[in-house]
């Protein structure tokens, strides 16, 4: 028997590798748009609104290639590492960094007060209160067994599966999945786009206080002299970085925000530094030599012992109790530390204080914000501007154009056998036709060559029809179009003679499909820019 865990650092290494090797400069990766037709059965509007599930099979991959419309190369500036966005909000209790806290868990547990009894799939209250704490759909744990709540009121909970054993005087724990955010809210972004990590949340009671003062610094070329800032609500915050304006425009959403280094913060960080000493018990009976309370030198009563060097602190005493510990020098190189209090003038009846040092992560606070904030995601943000020089179709008020599928494709080949490295490519086939007269082909319809769609030598889906040039762009091709043949619209009944065939420059069915996302339809017009964002999380 063994127990193992993949650490968050492996996820971080994965996103770093993905960013470096999937996107420039080591590969040519393209963001593709496709699927002009509706989801589901076109004959049933209700089914057509249900987004299709992605299935990784050979048939589905081939169909994804057939449905492609256009692709645009992902530039180096189109990718960034991101973390879940957390805005500072007054009245919120934020979690503080502690060297013994599992910061990056997505599991939030809330223990209900009081006890309960359980039999089969029914939990009845003993002294617990259910209303306001439990809802249908929540996951709860009782006697080490997890169940989903299917019914609840003030006096009982009904779960989906019977418990193995009856429970008397048990404790109910509600378990919430906070993904993509972490269960511990230990960092914030302020109104100036400055990002801070919480080092102390205002009290040493293990719970903390509500934050009422927004952390902020004025940057004029220098950072604050202290490694952290203190606000009047008792919080201590470590400044990490400011989100650059350009990155905010491209990678900032309601859920995600970019994470970067601040060179000055990195240069000022110290590995194994002690920035915070918490008072778990202030003790009693501590006095100065003259019997008055006040500041006491750490050399006389406080020593920080461990495998690092240089940590020096002072203590403030009020009525014989240690009420505050001030760090004069956080030292460096600590992986463990013990705060020893030795006051020769302590009253014989006094109790020893319990002070606990919090050691910074490897490199120090601010040395690597991506690791410190648990970065496990990379965002791609690509702009499709208008027609991209007559490469990507757009619609009109009369003939709308839309797409429903987004794909990341690495290292596609061109028809001439070399790797694609251009900026934008059309992946549809262009048919030059004779004028269909008063009829017009309609987007999304099937066109065919033959006596009927069922008895045809060629079928394709209309992506876009340009009546001004009599050019028809199609994908999802079956068979080969022949010049001189009659092309018929399956819905419009429009007919034309094929005058020319221009295949796409890109060779379909080449390259690696790394990501497929099916969405609701996105409608394009000539004056529109789509900023398509994809987030890959691990």
Where are these regions (language model features)?
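Extracellular/surface recognition and adhesion modules
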Residues: 116, 123, 130, 137-140, ...
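A structural micro-motif recognizing beta-strand termini
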Residues: 85-87, 92-108, 122-133, 143, ...
